[in-house]
Amino acid sequence: MSKKTVASLSAADISGKRALVRVDFNVPLDDQGNITDDTRIRAALPTIQDLTQKGAKVILASHFGRPKGVDEKLRLTPVAKRLSELLGQEVIKTDDSIGDEVAAKVATLQNGQVLLLENVRFYKEEEKNDPEFAKKLAANADFYVNDAFGTAHRAHASTEGVTKFLSPSVAGYLVEKELQYLQSAIENPQRPLAAIIGGSKVSSKIGVIETLLEKCDKLIIGGGMIFTFYKARGLNVGKSLVEEDKLELAKSLEAKAKERGVSLLLPTDVVLADNFAPDANSQTVSIENIPDGWMGLDIGPDSVKVFQAALADTKTVIWNGPMGVFEFDKFAAGTEAIAHTLAEIGKTGTTTIIGGGDSVAAVEKVGLADQMSHISTGGGASLELLEGKVLPGIAALDEA
């Protein structure tokens, strides 16, 4: 699915026009209301700067947290301040996202100026994709740009509803890059293609695993979900996390991999803990020797070697989900080793894609984010795209 992009709009097309740009400025704040990580704001800069340089009047819309109505703590004021610093120009901030105050401020905008609307989720109509609310949001603009990949899997008023009232509706640079990497990895990858899927639950990754079994040459599984596979094989897993209702599914996934000739790799050894704590006692054992009363919190060193060998000849790797409880330093070695491995194979031309969520945090923790080909900004959106699902916020944009 090829979408029309902001890059295709010329200055002649949009100079003096009002652009409604959906961004994802849902950034973390500390107790004092200071932004602790501005990655999402920086990610939107290429689109904003492109529009201002082409002479558009830029109106930004974002959600922030999960407010139930107006919440003073969830106003976008700190975001406007940070964005002003990053752009090197004043960002005008409104106290609402629709209505007379907004219309009045938009009317004063000069070409190349930027205005940030208040948190669109202050209205419950946003998440209900209410057409009247979408119409009011769209009333102050001439065309629409979606650069909020992280919410593209939601059909909300500011991601989907507004496209019915604004034309053209196009993808921003961030959304374009996400589609380029995540879709081509699934639809037309350089092979061999390997996927590394981690995380604690099989249930949350079933769709991705099933899709990837159709597309991948190798599938590596780590994280807490491995114990559901082991138990399905009849192994003792101690008090490790197991989804009892997914044992048959685990068996069928292994059978499906075999049938398709996909190399499905599970860890050969695990790091165990006597309880779920950063300072727990630990021991490393092979998967056949997990004693009662212990729980697995990371993959072991032998597994790391096996996975490294499997990844050595790959041309494309998608990684979604950690290998263990990497928040605890004692149980972070497996996840960190995978991050280092991807950085290494990336140097020899392998495309490395970090598919959102906790694996992004893991790569950032070890300082290797800039050595990956692509780091997805979406959690749920990345997963759904990798599953081959249609994302409403993308589907609503104009075809190229």
Curated annotation (Swiss-Prot):
Transmembrane segments: none annotated. Its main location: cytoplasm. It is an enzyme of class 2 (transferase). Pfam families: PGK. ATP binds at K205, G296, E327, G356, G357, D358, S359. GO terms for molecular function: ADP binding; ATP binding; phosphoglycerate kinase activity. Pathway: Carbohydrate degradation; glycolysis; pyruvate from D-glyceraldehyde 3-phosphate: step 2/5. GO terms for cellular component: cytosol. It is found in: Cytoplasm. GO terms for biological process: gluconeogenesis; glycolytic process. Its EC number is 2.7.2.3. Keywords: ATP-binding, Cytoplasm, Glycolysis, Kinase, Nucleotide-binding, Transferase. Substrate binds at D24, F25, N26, R40, H63, F64, G65, R66, R121, R154. CDD domains: Phosphoglycerate_kinase. Disulfide bonds: none annotated. InterPro entries: Phosphoglycerate_kinase, Phosphoglycerate_kinase_N, Phosphoglycerate_kinase_sf. It catalyses: (2R)-3-phosphoglycerate + ATP = (2R)-3-phospho-glyceroyl phosphate + ADP. Belongs to the phosphoglycerate kinase family. PANTHER family: PHOSPHOGLYCERATE KINASE, PHOSPHOGLYCERATE KINASE 1, CHLOROPLASTIC-RELATED. Monomer. This is Phosphoglycerate kinase. It comes from Nostoc sp. (strain PCC 7120 / SAG 25.82 / UTEX 2576).
